[in-house]
Amino acid sequence: MTRSEALFEQAKKTIPGGVNSPVRAFNGVGGSPLFIEKADGAYIYDADGKAYIDYVGSWGPMILGHNHPKIREAVLAAVHNGLSFGAPTELEVQMAEKVIAMVPSIEQVRMVSSGTEATMSAIRLARGFTNRDKILKFEGCYHGHADCLLVKAGSGALTLGQPSSPGIPEDFAKHTLTAVYNDLDSVRTLFEQYPIEIACIIIEPVAGNMNCIPPIPGFLEGLRTMCDEFGALLIIDEVMTGFRVSRSGAQGHYGVTPDLTTLGKVIGGGMPVGAFGGRKDVMQFIAPTGPVYQAGTLSGNPIAMSAGLAQMEALCEEGLYEALSAKTKRIAEGFKAAADKHGIPMAINYVGGMFGFFFTEQEQITRFDQVTKCNIEHFRTFYHGMLDEGVYLAPSAYEAGFLSMAHGEEELRLTLEAADRVLARMKAAM
């Protein structure tokens, strides 16, 4: 028994399922999860001391790589001044100014401690501002585990085969309408059915919780048009895509302006941070300037703000996003080339620092229903083959992969050589 396996057995005695977030349990791929002891650059190291090239990156935040010296130094410097004050700090102001400077649609921003808090608060704000109850989301998109959003969700809920979750009253769920991602007709049908009841649309601009599915041309623009037509707010959930797809997020990459934006992951530099922001007239509706209540004991935590600011400043380096996109393209297209070489059907998607691959004969994956038809057994075999080769991918067929600036030529080469060997073994076993 490895030390990771022993720790997993020990953890299950005191922690439900042995993990503090379901996808970490390896239910989507089988076997026991790795327990990680440390990380540096493009690598993570398990409890047995084995190194892995990491394409999870803590599920997105580690865009510069693990243990980046600038972030580490910023955190250590902040710790000397105290861990938490429960009062405003200059760091919060600096972070707000940095976010607003990088994302033109955000005129004011409120810090929170998680992506779930950000989306939950943005939904409440949209409902309060419009005085409407219903929200519109998309099947397979995940916006955290708030009751109103855990309906036909992606991420861990999809991995577990649960389109929603027990514990959510029907009275809550009935206010959540679900449309088909990349299908404007399905959205219009719902707006025509509830023309004055929908407070907002919330969407992942690149769906990263049913693997990786970018928007088709015109889709995000069409949502903007319909929101304007029916008086609803457009919330773009950039918890995953914010500052990863481009310096101004997916909205900047695709040229779409939302009313509200939710952020997380990258802005924390590895610390627990979320945020929501947008039009000033909407944001002024939040307490203490408005009637919609939202609060948080650790919101704007000085240690988290220090880590986030250090990362955000580093992301302003010229040419960084072009280099990150080139790395991502090489991995995604390299996987596809290796699969083609060995006669194993595969489709790929990638944008910015995100990528996805699907074992399927479908040429292009653009919708949730297509994702559910992919070959999960092939994914599981490939996953464990890559793990044995020292490559750590997301342990679910429904999660995007992430590159970092720490992934260099050596890591990319080793990853693609490993993929070639694993796919060759898979073909030989068919």
Swiss-Prot record:
| Pathway recorded for this protein | Porphyrin-containing compound metabolism; protoporphyrin-IX biosynthesis; 5-aminolevulinate from L-glutamyl-tRNA(Glu): step 2/2
List N6-(pyridoxal phosphate)lysine occurrences by residue: 265
Tell me where in or outside the cell this protein is found: Cytoplasm
* Gene Ontology biological process terms from the UniProt entry: protoporphyrinogen IX biosynthetic process
Q: Which cofactor does it need?
A: pyridoxal 5'-phosphate
Q: Which CDD domains match?
A: OAT_like
This entry's Enzyme Commission designation comes to 5.4.3.8
Lipid biosynthesis recorded as keyword: no
- Major localization class: cytoplasm
Does this UniProt record's set of keywords contain Mitochondrion?
A: no
Q: Which Gene3D superfamilies match?
A: Aspartate Aminotransferase, domain 1, Type I PLP-dependent aspartate aminotransferase-like (Major domain)
Keywords, comma-separated and alphabetical: Cytoplasm, Isomerase, Porphyrin biosynthesis, Pyridoxal phosphate
Q: List cellular component terms (GO).
A: cytoplasm
Q: Which family does this protein fall into? A: Belongs to the class-III pyridoxal-phosphate-dependent aminotransferase family. HemL subfamily.
NCBIfam families attached here?
hemL, PRK00062.1
Q: How does it assemble?
A: Homodimer.
- List the protein's name: Glutamate-1-semialdehyde 2,1-aminomutase
